[in-house]
Amino acid sequence: MPLLRFDLIEGRDQSSLKKLLDVAHNVVVEAFDVPQQDRYQIVHEHPENHMIIEDTGLGFNRTKNLVVLSVTSKSRPEEKKQKFYRLLAERLESECGIASTDLIVSIVENDNADWSFGLGEAQFLTGKL
């Protein structure tokens, strides 16, 4: 159950935003082997001057198409994370026109006790999930 939070510069139209979210979800399903209906995405849009995202010395420029993706997830093997990064960059570029240099991903891991999907229960601990 990854939770994806997207920080974007405001101005994308609804169809572009939907495509971005759909592509990201399909990559999560493929790379992390989660069920199709396991979809949790939140979008935060910011004025351009509210995001200062540089290249960390890698030598490229960012554009207004910038996507900063924070993923909260249970622990995943390194190879699945690498697959996620690669597929996401490839598909956002090919399907959404977002350059791989405009993608930043951070994965924060947590454990089964850190999730409740409602009803005041930790369903991963109770066995309901």
From Swiss-Prot:
Main EC class the enzyme belongs to: isomerase
InterPro entries: Tauto_MSAD, Tautomerase/MIF_sf
EC number: 5.3.2.-
Alphabetical list of Pfam families matching this protein: Tautomerase_2 (PF14552)
Annotated catalytic residues: P2 (proton acceptor)
Family: Belongs to the 4-oxalocrotonate tautomerase family.
Glycosyltransferase among keywords: no
Keywords: Isomerase
Function: Putative target of GltR.
Protein name as annotated: Probable tautomerase YrdN
Molecular function GO labels: isomerase activity
Organism: Bacillus subtilis (strain 168)
Keyword field contains Isomerase: yes
